[in-house]
Regions:
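Conserved glycine-centered short motifs in functionally critical loops
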Residues: 63-192
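OB-fold/S1-family RNA-binding modules
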Residues: 1-69, 74, 159, 177-192
Length: 192
């Protein structure tokens, strides 16, 4: 449990009862956050969880107003590239890049948590000329990782427009937990 979790919903009575027993034993003050979901629409459909689960294994993650981030974990580091795609505003190219980068910063922090990615992370945001915009994106990324229980350190934007950061490895990444390497490919292919 973290402070940003308001509630946990479980849609099956016996699972709810087991979770409640567990919480009463381990964290009794949080049992009031546990609820039995009784809606007609399945819980996973209501909150689009299947879509989120499917998306978590994809390399490219679409952003809400267009654009995307591309996540490439390697043995050495995690490279994340921000692409503008169809994202447009009526403002200047600089302002458009700034707005997209702000959106991307929030999604990058979210994806790092969801995928359990750690180590060195290099974020290649869309180039911005204005110093105040570069600092604004750094601030947005710092604010977005505050919810993360993993320790993070974010450096200032490099002369190449990259924001380097580190994120504590709490457990093996989702990719390493779900997939196994194919021996015939010498580690370049994966099987789920």
């Amino acid at each position: 449990f973290t402070s940003d979790v308001d509630a946990i919903y479980i849609d099956e009575q016996s699972a709810h009862d087991r979770a409640k027993d567990f919480l009463q034993f381990v964290m009794p003050r949080h049992t009031n956050r546990l609820h039995l979901y009784g809606g007609k629409e399945p819980l996973f459909h209501r909150y689009e969880l299947e879509l989120e689960i499917a998306r978590i294994h994809q390399r490219e993650v679409p952003l809400k107003d267009g654009g995307s981030i591309v996540i490439d974990p390697t043995d050495a580091l995690v490279a994340i590239d921000v692409n503008s795609g169809s994202f447009r505003t009526n403002d200047s190219a600089e302002e458009t890049a700034y707005q997209l980068n702000l959106t991307a910063a929030k999604e990058i922090a979210r994806q790092l948590r969801l995928r359990d990615l750690g180590g060195v992370v290099v974020n290649d945001f869309i180039d911005m000329r204005k110093e105040k915009h570069r600092r604004g994106v750094e601030r947005a990324l710092r604010d977005a990782v505050k919810r993360d229980r993993a320790r993070t350190k974010i450096l200032r934007t490099s002369p190449f427009g990259l924001i380097e950061m580190t994120r504590q490895r709490i457990r093996p990444s989702l990719k390493r937990s779900v997939f196994r390497q194919l021996p015939a490919c010498i580690g370049s292919g994966l099987v789920k």
